[in-house]
Structure formats: C-alpha cells, structure tokens
Design a protein with these regions (language model features):
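Conserved acetyl-CoA-binding loop-helix of GNAT-fold acetyltransferases
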Residues: 113-131
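Conserved beta-strand-loop-alpha-helix junction that forms the acyl-donor binding cleft
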Residues: 113, 140-151, 164-171
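Conserved acetyl-CoA-binding loop of GNAT-fold acetyltransferases
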Residues: 154-164
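Conserved GNAT acetyl-CoA-binding A-motif
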Residues: 106, 132-145
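Short glycine-/small-residue motifs
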Residues: 65-68
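A short helix-loop-beta-strand connector motif used in the catalytic cores of GNAT acetyltransferases and
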Residues: 45-61, 72-81
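C-terminal "cap" of GNAT-fold acetyltransferases
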Residues: 166-198
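Conserved acyl-donor/pantetheine-binding loop and adjacent beta-alpha core of acyl/acetyltransferases
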Residues: 70-107
Length: 198
C-alpha cells in the first residue's frame, strides 16, 4: 500500500512538472484606460507616455492583457512621483545626446493585474526584458506606502531599498546568477571551438 501511494505521488509530481506553464508576451501598450489603475489613477495617459516613459502589458495565450506596468527611466531612485517626473525628464534630455539611451534605472511606478496571477507574471517578463537590456542596470519600484504593495514585491523576490514620506522603493536583483555567467562562458567557448571531422 505504501509503495502504491509513493508511485502515485511520483506520478503526480511528474505530471505537475510536465504541465504547460502559461506563456506571456511582453508588449508596449499605446493606450490604457488610466481609470483602471488602482495604484495611480490620477496620472494621465500623456504623463505615462511623455519624456521616454513607457507602458507595458503582458498578453496571454488567449490574446488578453493579463497585467499592466508603467515605467519611467532615470539615473537615480526617486522618493516621490514629482521627483520621478523631474528625474525622467532629465534622463530624456540627456538621451538626446546619447543616441536615445535613456536612464540606467527602470522605475516601475504602477502595476496591476487584469487576470489572476498577472502581476507576478508581469514582474517575471519585465525582469527578463531588463536583464537582456544593454543599458538598464536596475529595476526599482516607486510603490505606495501600503502593506499590499510591500507584501507583493517581497513575495516576488524584491528587496526593500528605502521607505519615504509617501512612497517606498523595492529593488529586483537583475545581476546574472553564477549559473547564468557559467552558461554564457560555456556557450561562448563552444561557439569559438573549431570542429573538425576525421
């Protein structure tokens, strides 16, 4: 009886591992209904798209937007929306002289899920995008001072940077892990290997 139970548990784990995980596509959104934003509905669409700021969404397999995240790009960590506005304007002006490269820090100032689990998948997709970026080195939030925001970011792997008067900042570590560094070295070495057939 114990053996049968153990076999069932092993099979259950195998089935779970083989289950198809949902696929998402990160896309830049040209339009959103800002009134749907539960975090910062007061920020206009124009604000979210000016001075190099961007709006991203993740599209699920059904073609629906599962979550939305808005970004500003800066060189420092802002403590308020007003500071973020000024910093992203400054980074946008500097980008004119740097072939369009704007800011080294992606500031996620609002995120919301339109479908269950969308927020977590949004963080994962943005994490991948920033990790693959040539000029972004950090992913930091400008979150409201709520327990819900704190729990969400800590649960998804962020570290608290600072608590401000009206906001709090969390940072997602986007440095390559040791495994990823080793994988990169092995891949590069393999590409540079001359193969000969004898």
């Amino acid at each position: 009886k114990t053996r049968s139970y153990t076999n069932k548990m092993v099979l259950k784990k195998i089935y779970k591992a083989l289950e198809k995980s949902p696929k998402f596509e990160l896309i830049e959104l040209p339009f959103i209904d800002v009134t749907e934003d539960p975090v910062r509905p007061e920020l206009s669409l124009e604000f979210r798209q000016s001075h190099g700021r961007k709006i991203y969404g993740i599209r699920d397999e059904e073609g629906d937007i599962a979550a939305v995240m808005c970004f500003a790009f800066t060189h420092d960590i802002p403590k308020s929306v007003e500071e973020m506005d000024a910093m992203s304007r400054d980074a946008a002006m500097q980008a004119i002289h740097r072939a369009g490269v704007q800011g080294t820090i992606a500031i996620a100032y609002t995120v919301w899920a339109k479908k269950k689990g969308g927020g977590k998948h949004m963080v994962n997709e943005v994490y991948k995008m920033i990790k693959e970026s040539n000029h972004l080195s950090r992913l930091v939030t400008l979150s409201p001072l709520t327990d819900m925001a704190r729990k969400f970011h800590l649960k998804n792997g962020a570290k608290e940077v600072q608590v401000n008067l009206t906001t709090q900042n969390f940072e997602y570590n986007i440095e390559l892990s040791e495994w990823e560094k080793l994988k990169g070295k092995v891949t590069e070495k393999w590409r540079n290997t001359t193969w000969s057939i004898k």
